[in-house]
């Protein structure tokens, strides 16, 4: 109480005009039964609830119908013994669960808020323009994955959900995903619009904020993009000694701050619009970070100057725990389980972790949290892939962390929506029931008895956000400390309130407990699917696979025949081409031969003509020579004749 009055004094000095508000808050805290006492005390579990439930209206409580649900869990502690069977680790008990309540969302109001923003007003131009506003909302806008916390000083539930815009009208192909904060009253009715006087944890200043509202996040996007923006919001409360709630919002985002990869970010919307990238020192960032589970230690720093530190379960297998500054985003790995402390990859990120809502006598250095991770099982008997919540008890002893308890799958008696929204739970390709956040854990005394109700937000089939109320979970867990009835033959006395971490047994038993829980979850999955469309889905799947196989075989046969025909045609064309080349070669050779013969004939004719000419010339020469000789002889004869005549004349 001293811390509360110190804060009130500081707060009143800064804002004298808020004295009245301060007094109202103080009276409200007293009325609600808040006790600012240490979280570790000596003695049995101390119930220090309010006189009446602080989270629920009586009329709402009276309207809830609870039914029993079995929670089959497995423990890592067996009094120091190394266990080899699931039976030796098994713990079974009952809790009660309410029916699911789907949380309404005034999408028309949210859409107008988005359109009025400078960053996202252009989305209005991407909607179909030839349909009504109601049709546009139904076609282009989608929402799911809501995580909430209860703000006691305002008596409202603060919920952060994803709101997606799809230009093509498909939730699995959004242009962008945004974070929207909403308020719900104690009966889970949406408050739209509703204004709260928000106290800034850093300055003490009071500022009115109207909800629903967009949470400011610097998103790098364009109208032609797909799958940009924020995903998987988780909201959790930072511990406070002043009674002023400070919700922290965790989400992942693709950003140039992490080289275009998808990184983890946090923001404190009641403190400032600042968004911090969580960066682990000396660790290469994977392409996509997700599924971190936040929790606070008892020694969390409470200061108006600093947001302090938060821890995360970075992964369950191997178990890795990191510590991050909420002021800078700087993180470092503080725990990693050894090789023997590892199991399969079916266990995924959990809800934010919360402490038990009672004061336990815990040894120094020991802290205990409750959370709901989810399993991801393939081909277990309900759709191809099945997501379901499981209960875990997470423990810190000194500088060691481990899972004390892990349950089989829990569906809270929900017939999970089919992923295609067309058939039974298991009729789609995947069956999705994901726990998003622990809103509150209310403890009350009434008519000499006591009651605890944990409120959990979940999402079905990536289509909605629902809330369920779990009654009696605290009793279920306190049995592990020797309180209340034992439902089986084992004694788990002082499991919570003693240190029993032994490196040679606890890690091995934790692995065995997880394996047993996964095995049990597979058995649950099979039984769940047998009555919720799995046989029909499987038969349809087999028929589709048969048809697909026949189609592929037919296509393969047709392809083979086509390839064969193509090959035969290619061979025919090749043979024809070869024959054509042979013909052309033969014709060329014949042409060459004909040309050669013509040349030879021409040469022969020429030679014959030349020979004939030579012979004729020779004959002519002979004739000429003969004529010349005859002429010469005639001339000689004439000369002799004349000489004779002359001689005759001389004689005469």
Swiss-Prot record:
The chain crosses the membrane at residues 16-34. Residues 536-621 are annotated as: Disordered. Glycans are attached at residue 57. It is found in: Membrane. Residues 35-652 are extracellular. It is a single-pass type II membrane protein. Disruption phenotype: Impaired expression of beta-mannose epitopes and decreases alpha-mannosidase resistant glycans. Beta-mannosyltransferase involved in cell wall biosynthesis. Involved in the beta-mannosylation of outer chains of N-glycans. This is Beta-mannosyltransferase 1. It comes from Komagataella phaffii (strain GS115 / ATCC 20864). The gene is BMT1.
């Amino acid at each position: 109480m001293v811390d509360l009055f110190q804060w009130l004094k500081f707060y009143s000095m800064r804002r004298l005009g808020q004295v009245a508000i301060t007094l109202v808050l103080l009276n409200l805290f007293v009325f609600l039964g808040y006790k600012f006492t240490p979280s570790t005390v000596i003695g049995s579990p101390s119930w220090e609830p309010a006189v009446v439930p602080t989270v629920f209206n009586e009329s709402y409580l009276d309207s809830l119908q609870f039914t029993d649900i079995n929670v089959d869990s497995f423990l890592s502690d067996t009094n120091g013994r190394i266990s080899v069977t699931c039976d030796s680790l098994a713990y079974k008990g009952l809790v009660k669960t309410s029916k699911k309540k789907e949380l309404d969302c005034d999408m028309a109001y949210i859409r107008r808020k988005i359109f009025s923003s400078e960053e996202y007003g252009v989305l209005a131009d991407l909607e179909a323009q030839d349909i009504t506003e109601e049709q546009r909302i139904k076609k282009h806008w989608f929402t799911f994955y809501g995580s909430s916390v209860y703000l006691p000083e305002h008596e409202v539930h603060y919920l952060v959900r994803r709101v997606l815009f799809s230009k093509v009208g498909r939730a699995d192909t959004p242009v962008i995903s945004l974070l929207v904060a909403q308020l719900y009253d104690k009966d889970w009715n949406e408050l739209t619009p509703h204004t709260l006087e928000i106290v800034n944890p850093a300055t003490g200043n009071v500022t009115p904020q109207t909800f629903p509202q967009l949470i400011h996040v610097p998103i790098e996007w364009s109208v032609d993009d797909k799958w940009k923006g924020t995903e998987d919001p988780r909201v959790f409360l930072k511990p406070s000694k002043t009674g002023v709630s400070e919700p922290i919002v965790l989400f992942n985002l693709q950003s140039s701050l992490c080289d275009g990869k998808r990184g983890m970010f946090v923001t404190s919307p009641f403190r400032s619009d600042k968004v911090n990238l969580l960066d682990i020192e000396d660790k290469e960032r994977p392409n996509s970070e997700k599924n971190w589970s936040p929790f606070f230690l008892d020694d969390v720093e409470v200061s108006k100057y600093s947001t302090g530190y938060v821890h995360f379960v970075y992964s369950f297998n191997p178990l890795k725990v990191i510590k991050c500054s909420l002021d800078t985003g700087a993180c470092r790995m503080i725990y990693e389980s050894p090789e023997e402390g590892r199991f399969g990859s079916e266990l995924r990120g959990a809800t934010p972790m919360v402490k038990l809502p009672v004061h336990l006598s815990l040894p120094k250095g020991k802290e205990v949290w409750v959370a709901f991770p989810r399993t991801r099982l393939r081909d277990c008997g309900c759709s191809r892939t099945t997501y379901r919540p499981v209960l875990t008890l997470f423990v810190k002893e000194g500088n060691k962390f481990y899972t004390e308890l892990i349950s089989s799958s829990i569906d809270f008696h929900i017939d999970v929506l089919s992923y295609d929204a067309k058939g039974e739970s298991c009729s789609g390709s995947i069956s999705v029931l994901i726990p998003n956040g622990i809103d509150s854990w209310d403890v009350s005394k009434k008519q000499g008895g006591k009651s605890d109700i944990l409120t959990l937000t979940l999402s079905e089939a990536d289509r909605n956000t629902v809330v369920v109320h779990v009654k009696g979970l605290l009793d279920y867990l306190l049995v592990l400390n020797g309180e209340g009835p034992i439902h089986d033959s084992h004694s788990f006395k002082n499991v919570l309130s003693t240190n029993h971490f032994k490196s040679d047994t606890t890690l091995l038993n934790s692995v065995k407990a997880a394996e047993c829980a996964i095995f049990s979850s597979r058995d649950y999955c099979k039984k769940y699917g047998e009555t919720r469309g799995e046989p029909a889905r499987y038969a349809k799947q087999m028929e589709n696979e048969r048809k697909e196989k026949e189609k592929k075989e037919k296509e393969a046969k047709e392809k083979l025949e086509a390839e064969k025909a193509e090959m035969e045609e290619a061979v025919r064309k090749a043979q024809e081409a070869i024959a054509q080349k042979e013909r052309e070669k033969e014709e060329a050779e014949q042409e060459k031969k004909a040309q050669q013969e013509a040349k030879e004939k021409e040469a022969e004719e020429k030679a014959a003509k030349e020979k004939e000419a030579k012979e004729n010339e020779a004959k002519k020469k002979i004739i000429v020579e003969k004529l010349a000789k005859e002429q010469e002889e005639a001339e000689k004869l004439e000369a002799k004749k004349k000489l004779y005549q002359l001689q005759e004349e001389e004689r005469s």
